[in-house]
């Protein structure tokens, strides 16, 4: 089993990378992460993590996934973990369905690594439910 490591970077207000913060050791599910970084806003550090499908989807699936994916489930998970400030946005400019979750960064790196693994698992489970739900709906989207 191959493990993935993701370098957590910090960006400035102009979106320029200014610092390498840490390396997060993640399992195979890291394939669901498009990007993750820290950014300062209002004198606080925020984590932004973009989660997507781990592989390409067909055109009809793109729309169906957005229709059936429940961002609120992920937000509920984040809030249950103390991320009451968490927000989600859809990244329409991405090739595959992608959601960006943003919340205040307040953990030690080891705790963040565990948290990101759990978050990706919740996202992966939601996508699996979505794919089961849409598997016979191609005709509705063509």
Please place each PLM-identified region on the residue numbering.
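Short, extreme N-terminal segment that most often corresponds to the first beta-strand
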Residues: 1-21
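Short, internal acidic amphipathic alpha-helical interface segments
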Residues: 58-98
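Ordered hydrophobic segments in well-structured contexts
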Residues: 5-8, 48-52, 89, 98-104
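A generic structural signal for short, non-catalytic loop/turn and secondary-structure boundary residues
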Residues: 1, 44, 94-96
């Amino acid at each position: 089993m191959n493990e993935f490591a993701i370098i957590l970077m910090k960006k400035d207000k102009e979106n320029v990378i200014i610092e390498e913060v840490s390396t997060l050791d993640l399992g195979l599910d890291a394939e669901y992460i498009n990007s993750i970084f820290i950014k300062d806003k209002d004198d606080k550090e925020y984590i932004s993590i973009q989660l997507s499908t781990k592989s390409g989807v067909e055109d009809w699936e793109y729309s169906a996934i957005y229709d059936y994916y429940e961002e609120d489930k992920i937000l509920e998970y984040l809030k249950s973990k103390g991320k009451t400030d968490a927000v989600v946005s859809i990244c329409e400019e991405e090739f595959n369905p992608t959601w960006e979750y943003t919340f205040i960064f307040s953990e030690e790196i080891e705790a963040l690594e565990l948290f990101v693994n759990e978050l990706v698992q919740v996202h992966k489970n939601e996508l699996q439910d979505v794919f089961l739900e849409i598997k016979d709906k191609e005709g509705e989207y063509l």
